[in-house]
Amino acid sequence: VTTPTKPRSAYHRGRDLEHRVRTHLREEGYEVLRTAGSKSKVDLVAIKPGQILFVQCKRSGALPPAEWNALWDLAQMVGAVPVLAEQLTRGRRYWRLTARKDRPGARQPYVELTLDELAAGVAV
């Protein structure tokens, strides 16, 4: 007899994405701390010598202006790189926030980020 499975909640799917991103960043040599708790400004803090990434993980790749600006402001305050990790069908994509977000639906001010750029010391 097979027991029907419950659909996974949005919380569990989001947490799973955070764990996958954390694992990937660790494989890239970062020390990664997960900030457990819903609605925090930062999901993951990734640290390498001379680098701090503040990472917000979103399956949709979209952040409302209030969350966007909270992440941006906090990163600016301490000199961290604000990063949005987006879930793709296979793998993930990283975006570096480049400015505050003015309004909902506006094109998000970001550029694609590869971790190799950071390792090579490319200006971020």
Language-model features, listed with the residues they occupy:
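Structural signal for conserved beta-strand scaffold positions within catalytic alpha/beta enzyme cores
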Residues: R34, Q56, L84-E86
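Active-site-adjacent loop/helix micro-motif of nuclease/hydrolase catalytic cores
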Residues: S60-L71
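Alpha-helix C-cap/termination motif
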Residues: E28, I47, M77-V78
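Acidic-basic catalytic patches of nuclease active cores, encompassing PD-(D/E)XK
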Residues: V1-T35
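Short, surface-exposed beta-edge/turn micro-motifs
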Residues: K41-V42, Q51-I52, A80-V83
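Conserved catalytic cores of phosphodiester-cleaving nucleases, focusing on short active-site segments
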Residues: L25, L44-G61
